[in-house]
């Protein structure tokens, strides 16, 4: 039977498996024995490994860090690498983010596009390739990681425990045709203490869910006299609400969520809130801190005022996302996610940003750095995937660079390939994340064809 027909026959089982896994809220949680990234992430991994075993594949679970199934008997191995962990659902959904609901030819839920949909499609693509009877000389391993959204500690564990390195492979966690360049990514956490003085005091402030998500909402509580609260509550500004309360003033800011790699597609609610607070009569270190943050970051997405506005011809501008800010009784913690161009280096930006924050009284308390990635267009890996893309889609195109970071940086000989086609609406990390059912099956077919071309 032709490979295309074998993939088509997998559709009902693929949809059922995907719906079941989408109903598991696999956001990183507290570590437990055998579940280093939380109970729900482990449930998601157990579910997909059980599905692989039901299809007749041998599976492996590496201490809850990641798992895989495999087909074939060759000495060399090619890999398809996806992830089951997802970012928090956030607000403003029209559907249950953990429902896996199918409506109007789309399946909705957190992880449909990033990355459960394509990762689970890879399992059924492997089953289709096996059922087709096409001969292969290399083993094919489909891996499911559990920590892609929060540092890729799973891949570090895989390499540290001598996990097998593929001769080539891909992660269906980017865009078509092929992503051969990925910006360097830095997640940094800053903290500081502020005094509480004056008639108007900042009690608390909260905004954002993760460093790699543009925050869609932020709010602040301020203590002040009833008279001052009533006067400030009369203020009006777009996407801001000022409300007088029994303790003083409550300020809410609205934004637009987007993926942290493309912050320019969103509107940062934290930045909007800080720009508003900067106009209020705060005093002391609180005033200084709010002014510094509003002036240095605000709602900018290119790091211009922070002094790190880098650019190159291959991958474009540095991008910066102010992902979280939390203040309680004068204690502040915040996280920034920024991504530098593929021809630049960590040293071109990190020391500059750190220096600005240190000079303003902040302390850097944590940092995660993923180095840039660039695979030449003429490499066997890129040319093979480009050929598959052209043959399967009927479309042309060129390899591209992105700001998003994938497992391609974590495992040698890997690039990102799919699942997003040119012109598709991108809903990853946003409310109402979905994947067109037709695109799900096109991805399954593309993955199966790529597996075969690499393994034959």
Regions found by a protein language model. Give the residues of each.
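Acidic, glycine-rich active-site loops and adjacent beta-strand->loop/helix elements
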Residues: 84-86, 140-151, 172-177, 209, ...
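Beta-strand segments within the central parallel beta-sheet cores of soluble alpha/beta enzyme folds
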Residues: 137-145, 204, 291-292, 366
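Midchain, well-structured core segments that form catalytic/ion-binding scaffolds
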Residues: 156-157, 161-341
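Acidic/His- and Gly-rich active-site-bordering loop/insert found
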Residues: 2-110, 131-136
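Active-site metal-coordination/substrate-binding segment of hydrolases
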Residues: 77-144, 150, 162-167, 430-438, ...
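An extended, acidic, His-containing surface patch that forms the Zn2+-binding/catalytic region
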Residues: 60, 254, 261-329, 339-351, ...
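Acidic-glycine-rich active-site phosphate/pyrophosphate-binding loop
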Residues: 87-103, 190-197, 243-253, 358-359, ...
């Amino acid at each position: 039977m032709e490979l295309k027909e074998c993939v088509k026959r997998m559709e009902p089982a693929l949809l059922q498996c995907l719906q079941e896994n989408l109903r598991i809220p696999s956001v990183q949680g507290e570590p437990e024995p055998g579940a280093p990234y939380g109970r729900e992430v482990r449930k998601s991994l157990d579910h997909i490994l059980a599905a692989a075993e039901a299809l007749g594949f041998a599976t492996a679970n590496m201490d809850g860090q990641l798992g895989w199934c495999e087909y074939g008997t060759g000495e060399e191995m090619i890999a398809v690498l996806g992830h089951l962990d997802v970012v928090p659902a956030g607000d403003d959904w029209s559907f249950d983010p953990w429902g896996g609901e199918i409506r109007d030819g789309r399946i909705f839920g957190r992880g449909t596009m990033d990355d459960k949909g394509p990762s689970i499609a890879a399992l059924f693509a492997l089953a289709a390739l096996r059922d087709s009877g096409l001969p292969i000389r290399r083993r094919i391993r489909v891996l499911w990681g559990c920590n892609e959204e929060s540092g890729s500690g799973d891949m570090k564990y895989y390499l540290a425990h001598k996990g097998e390195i593929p001769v080539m492979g891909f992660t269906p966690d980017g865009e078509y045709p092929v992503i051969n360049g990925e910006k360097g990514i830095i997640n940094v956490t800053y903290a500081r203490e502020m005094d509480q003085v004056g008639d108007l005091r900042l009690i608390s402030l909260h905004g954002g869910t993760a460093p790699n998500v543009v925050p869609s909402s932020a709010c602040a509580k301020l203590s002040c006299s009833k008279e001052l609260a009533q006067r400030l509550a009369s203020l009006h500004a777009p996407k801001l609400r000022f409300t007088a309360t029994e303790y003083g003033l409550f300020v809410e800011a609205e934004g637009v969520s987007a993926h942290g790699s493309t912050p320019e597609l969103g509107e940062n609610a934290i930045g909007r809130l800080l720009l508003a607070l900067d106009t209020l009569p705060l005093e002391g270190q609180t005033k200084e801190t709010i002014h510094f943050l509003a002036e240095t970051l605000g709602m900018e997405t290119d790091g211009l005022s922070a002094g790190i506005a880098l650019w190159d011809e291959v991958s474009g501008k540095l991008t910066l996302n102010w992902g979280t800010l939390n203040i309680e009784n004068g204690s502040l913690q915040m996280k920034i996610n920024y991504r530098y161009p593929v021809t630049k280096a960590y040293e071109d930006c990190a020391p500059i940003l750190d220096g600005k924050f240190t000079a303003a009284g902040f302390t850097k308390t944590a940092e995660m750095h993923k180095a840039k990635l660039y695979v030449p267009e003429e490499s066997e890996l890129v040319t093979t995937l480009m050929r598959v893309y052209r043959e399967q889609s009927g479309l042309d195109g060129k390899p591209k660079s992105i700001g998003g970071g994938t497992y391609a940086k974590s495992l040698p000989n890997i690039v990102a390939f799919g699942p997003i086609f040119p012109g598709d609406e991108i809903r990853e990390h946003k409310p109402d994340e979905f994947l067109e059912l037709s695109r799900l099956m096109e991805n399954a077919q593309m993955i199966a064809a790529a597996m075969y071309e690499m393994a034959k």
